[in-house]
Regions:
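Structured alpha/beta reader/binder surfaces that contact nucleic acids or chromatin modification marks
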Residues: 2-190
């Protein structure tokens, strides 16, 4: 498989949930957070890889990402516009970092405990592909995942902490962040 300039694409890809895959290629996201176990079992190392936009994305994840990215001046496209189930670009993995070795300029993206340090994102004309865990050899597929019904009718919920509808040309603003849709284990809820 080649890109528009007939350069061969990297044979390995990393599947990343949207909207974070978009943020890597278009939004300046320079760290892809992973556990050490995921890095080891996924055979992740430093090389140029394709970024695969995974098929999964829930409304709570998207809403939280809107808030998170807005806090660092990155505006997300509407959820229905995000490719899911395909290769969307390439990036160089240049290091594997922990918090104390993560360069200060990359800290807004670091959520730990480990991260792949990314450079040189290059968007591609999207190519449908099925994702896997870790680095995987990708092959072109037949079609992208169509938008879920919530994505096509998405209007951010106010829940008392957002301002919407009055000035549609302004970005969504939150006084407080939406509930974080991940990161709490069942054990911590006891």
């Amino acid at each position: 498989m080649t890109n528009e300039s007939n350069t061969p694409l990297p044979p390995l890809a990393l599947s990343v949930r949207q909207p974070w895959a978009w943020a890597i290629i278009h939004g300046g996201k320079t760290i892809e957070n992973r556990t050490l176990g995921a890095i080891r079992t996924g055979n992740m190392d430093c090389r140029t890889i394709c970024i695969h936009a995974a098929t999964g994305m829930r409304e709570k994840e998207y809403r939280w990402a809107v808030w998170k990215l807005q806090s660092i001046d990155v505006a997300l496209p509407p959820p229905a516009d995000l490719i899911r189930g395909g290769i969307i670009g390439t990036v160089d993995v240049v290091d594997i970092v922990i918090e104390k070795t993560c360069p200060e300029s990359h800290k807004p993206w670091f959520g730990g405990p480990y991260g792949l340090l990314l450079e040189n994102p290059k968007p591609l004309e999207p190519i449908p592909a099925v994702g896997e865990l870790g680095y995987f050899k990708w092959e072109a597929a037949v079609a992208f995942k169509p938008p879920a019904s919530w994505m096509s009718r998405y209007v951010p919920k106010m829940e008392g902490n957002g301002t919407l509808g009055l000035f549609d040309d302004l970005p969504i603003a939150f006084e407080t962040p939406p509930e974080k849709p991940f990161g709490t284990s069942k054990r911590s809820k006891k």
